[in-house]
């Protein structure tokens, strides 16, 4: 599984892993797993974390070594951003179902997610993703934006 990762990704994961391996013993605790993954741009839910930990932590000792961590990250990266998930996410933002995400729709969803954004910040997000310059985000632009992270 981990053999599908680039050397660069492996180096990045090793660096992140080391940051959280406080005592340098080559393992991280399960609590730290969520923090490590979030630092790498992943966003696992509590349930996903528990599942991953259960899969990886075979002896139930509450720690994960680097090879286990690598296979975990490889698995997680393979699962992210499927076409289906992107379509579902787009529908969440496109509240009126017209095929476009407006500034108002973006602001509404971001507010519901607990992100308090100024009008300027919302406009900036739209501008960054709005390839054709029509002031809103269509599905293609949304996919590009999501895959660029």
From Swiss-Prot:
Keywords: Acetylation, Calcium, Metal-binding, Methylation, Repeat. The modification N-acetylalanine is found at residue 2. Ca(2+) 1 binds at residues 21, 23, 25, 27, 32. The modification N6,N6,N6-trimethyllysine is found at residue 116. GO terms for cellular component: myosin II complex. Ca(2+) 2 binds at residues 57, 59, 61, 63, 68. Gene3D superfamilies: EF-hand (1.10.238.10). Ca(2+) 3 binds at residues 94, 96, 98, 105. CDD domains: EFh. SMART domains: EFh, efhand_Ca_insen. Disulfide bonds: none annotated. One of its GO terms (molecular function) is calcium ion binding. Residues 8-43, 44-79, 81-116, 117-149 form the EF-hand domain. Ca(2+) 4 binds at residues 130, 132, 134, 136, 141. Pfam families: EF-hand_7 (PF13499). This protein has four functional calcium-binding sites. Calmodulin mediates the control of a large number of enzymes, ion channels and other proteins by Ca(2+). Among the enzymes to be stimulated by the calmodulin-Ca(2+) complex are a number of protein kinases and phosphatases. Belongs to the calmodulin family. This is Calmodulin.
